């Protein structure tokens, strides 16, 4: 929670006064598709990214109401092949390559996109949650898309002993 939710808040708050003084700037927070829907074995991660999404959206609305030329983009990518999610299985939606995500993030910033789910279309999860009964939503995303079982074989990034940790 400190890294995924609080750190982006503190970084943005450090730069925001100068952006407001210049009346230009852009805050881009990288959240996660995991912050858009519940997912077994990801409750804390999902909650931390949900916090980043909510905070970013609130700041965006505040800046918009003040007629500021400072913009906010929130990006919610699916799993990215960085090693962090080693072992994740995705039946329909491909695991994303970092280069692909970077290009989409840059494009979203250049276009002042408020919210970008990656891959495209993934941002419609919110819409689906709003209009579908929970049982139907869970069936589609859990059984058909397979998101609720993506973490079944999760191993995560392998830890490397750097020799810097102290023995207890």
Question: Residue locations for each model-derived region?
Answer:
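Active-site helix of classical SDR
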Residues: 12, 48
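A short helix-coil junction within the Rossmann-fold of NAD(P)-dependent oxidoreductases
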Residues: 14-23
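Residue(s) in the substrate-gating loop at a strand-loop-helix junction
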Residues: 32
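SDR active-site lid
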Residues: 62-124, 135
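Catalytic tyrosine of NAD(P)H-dependent dehydrogenase/reductases that use a Tyr as the general acid/base
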Residues: 9, 45
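Active-site loop immediately N-terminal to the catalytic Tyr-X3-Lys motif
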Residues: 39-43
């Amino acid at each position: 929670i400190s890294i995924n939710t609080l750190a982006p808040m503190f970084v943005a708050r450090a730069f925001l006064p100068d952006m407001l003084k210049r009346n230009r700037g852009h805050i881009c927070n990288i959240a996660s598709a995991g912050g858009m829907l519940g997912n077994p074995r990801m409750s804390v991660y999902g909650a931390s990214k949900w916090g980043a999404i909510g905070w970013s959206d609130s700041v965006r609305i505040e800046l918009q109401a003040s007629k500021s030329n400072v913009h906010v983009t929130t990006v919610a990518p699916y799993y990215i092949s960085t090693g962090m999610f080693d072992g994740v299985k995705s039946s329909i939606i491909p695991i994303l390559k970092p280069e692909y995500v970077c290009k989409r993030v840059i494009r979203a910033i250049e276009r002042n996109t408020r919210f970008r789910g990656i891959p495209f279309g993934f941002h419609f999860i919110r819409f689906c949650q709003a209009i579908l009964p929970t049982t139907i939503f869970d069936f589609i995303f859990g059984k058909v898309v397979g998101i609720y079982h993506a973490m079944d074989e999760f191993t995560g990034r392998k830890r490397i002993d750097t020799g810097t940790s102290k023995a207890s």
